[in-house]
Structures are given as structure tokens and as C-alpha cells.
Amino acid sequence: MKLFDEYPYLTDGRILLRKIVPADAGALQALRTDKEVYRYLLTFLYEQKYPDVNEVIRRMDEECFQTKESLLLAVCLTEQPDELCGIAEIYAYEPWRRKASIGYRLRRAYWGRGIAMAVARLLREYLFRTVHLHTVTAHIMTDNRSSAAVLLKAGFPERYSNVLEDWGLEVPVLVDKYVLKEAEDLAEQTGIRIENEV
């Protein structure tokens, strides 16, 4: 399956990722207007593009999914599947390299509950097992230690530290890059290590 063939519905039994729908407008508005949520995030994230949250949802399919720019999914608890508690994102898809990046942001009421780690694991599983990518990356501001802990627990090793990137702010920001390769993911799942030939 290719990444943009269809919207996935992913669950681990506790968390689910699904398509964002018009009924999510209120929760999405609460998320996107919380400055603390966006403290360590890019200034040009899609949910911030239009003043009207309903327009964001209306245009999301056409401007993100159909153009294959990014895939944004609602993060929900399985016991509350209609309540958006955050956004999961797959972006920077490079099909010729079988590579993509992931991101996530949660409403503050859902912080500290292991949800971000579950999201990272669900995206990882989907991208390696279903989409058959070779590489999945995540970029976070160096100061964002909470997200660093999430990614490490989700199995993403830190590969590059203190890299300057343009995140739409007045000056470039220091970013840490977490990169997971398919062979490493397989080794973690099976306990079998694949060594490169010399």
C-alpha cells in the first residue's frame, strides 16, 4: 500500500488515529489556540493556516491529502472515538527513498498519559508494516525534552543533535533528529539483528 491510497484507521486498543471530520472543529480549535501546545512547534503547521477552524477541516483533504503533502489524523482514545485529543501527522514523504517524517501534538488535558508515545508507535508500525518504508524520522526542537523522551521510549534513536533548521521563526532553531530504519525496527520486534556485510 502507498501512503496516500486511503486514510488509515489505526488503533492499539487504547488509542486510535482516524480522519479529521467537521465534528472535530471545537476540539481542534481548543488545540490550535493553546500557545503552550505550540511552544516547540513550527509556525506553519496546517491547522494554523486559516482563521476559521471549519475552513481548515474543509480544505485539509484537498490541500494536504490529495496533494500528498501531509497526512493529518485525529488522535482519540478508543473509549471516546469522537473526541479529538490531538493530531498525528505524516509529512515529508519521499516515495523514491521510502522515507517519511512524523509529528504529533496533543491538547494539554492529555499530556503525561503515554498518548504521544502510543501515537509514535502506531505511526511507526503503520509506516513500516503497511506502507513498507525504509526510514521514519522525527525532528524536535532541542529544548523539547518531553518529546525527546517520548521518541526514545517509542524506539526512535537520536541521530543528529543541535542541527539548525528554518521553522518559520525569526531565526533558525536548534533541532534534534530522530531516525529509525526498517532493519532496526525489525530487530526490535523480533530480537534478530541484521548486520551490514563488510
Pin down the residues of each PLM region.
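Conserved GNAT-fold acetyl-CoA-binding loop/helix
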Residues: Y38-R59
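A short helix-loop-beta-strand connector motif used in the catalytic cores of GNAT acetyltransferases and
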Residues: R58-A74
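Acyl-donor (CoA/ACP) binding surface of acyl/acetyltransferases
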Residues: M1-R39, L72-V198
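Short, conserved alpha-helical segments within structured domains
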Residues: L45-K49, L71, D143
